[in-house]
Amino acid sequence: EEIGTVVTAGDEIATVSGLEHAAYGEILQFSSGVKGMVQDLRPDRVGCILFGGSEAIESGSIVRRTGKTAGIPVGDGFLGRVVDALGMPIDGQGDIPSEGYLPIESPAPGIIDRQPVNAPMETGLLAIDSMFPIGRGQRELIIGDRQTGKTAIALDTVLNQKGKGVVCIYVAIGQKSSSVAQLVENLKHKGAMDYTIVVNAPASASASLQYIAPYAGTALGEY
C-alpha cells in the first residue's frame, strides 16, 4: 500500500506528495472519506480533482492509492433509474445490481474497428428526419441559445425510440434538480424510462462530478 500526504487542497483540487507510482485516472482515498481522481503527474507530486468538498482536507493529511481506475458500475439494472456521475442511485429506489465495472476513460476504437453507420435513428421530427437524417452510431451536436428547444428535441428523440430496441442515456449537467425531476416524470408518464438511464450532475454538484458526468454516460452506453 502506497501512502502520501496532502500538500495543498482547495477549490476541489488537491496536490499530493509521496505517491510515486500513482497512475493517471487512478482513484485516491483521503483520510476524510473524500475520493479524488489523479489528473496531473509530476516527478515529486500528483494533482487530483476531488469528488466532494475540499473543506475537510487539510495539509499533511493521509492519502492512499486504491489501484483502481476511475470508473462506473454498469448493468441492465440501470435501465429506468436515475444515478449520479459515479453511478450511485439518487432516485430513492434502492441499490442497483451491477454486472461489471467500466473505466470512464477508455481508448477510442480505431476507424477499422468501428461498425459502419447504416441505419437511421428517427427523431420523430419530420424536418430533421427528412432533411438532416441522423444515423445510429454517429454524434450530433444540437446547438442554440437558451430556451430555443434543444432539450425538447432530445426528449422527443428519446420518446420516439419506444419499441425500437434502442437504449437511451440522458446526461443532465449543471441543470436544476427540479428540472431533471420534471423530465424524469415526463419520461415515466410516456413509458420511456423502461429503456432510458438518466445521469444527473446538477448545478449543486461539485465541478469534478459535472466534469466526469459525460464520461460516465458514455461508459454506460458502451456497456
Task: List each language-model region with its residue ranges.
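P-loop NTPase nucleotide-binding/switch module
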Residues: 61-63, 70, 74-77, 90-139, ...
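Conserved P-loop
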Residues: 148-195, 216
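Acidic-enriched and Gly/Ser
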Residues: 1, 5-121
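Hydrophobic/aromatic ligand-binding patch that stacks against planar heteroaromatic rings
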Residues: 133, 160, 223
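Conserved beta-strand elements of the Class I
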Residues: 7, 141, 167-169
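Conserved alpha-helical scaffold flanking the Walker A/P-loop in AAA+ ATPase domains
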Residues: 216-223
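Glycine-rich, histidine-containing beta strand-loop boundary motifs that form or position
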Residues: 50, 94, 144-146, 172-173
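Conserved nucleotide-binding/hydrolysis micro-motifs of P-loop NTPases
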Residues: 21, 53-56, 69-70, 87-89, ...
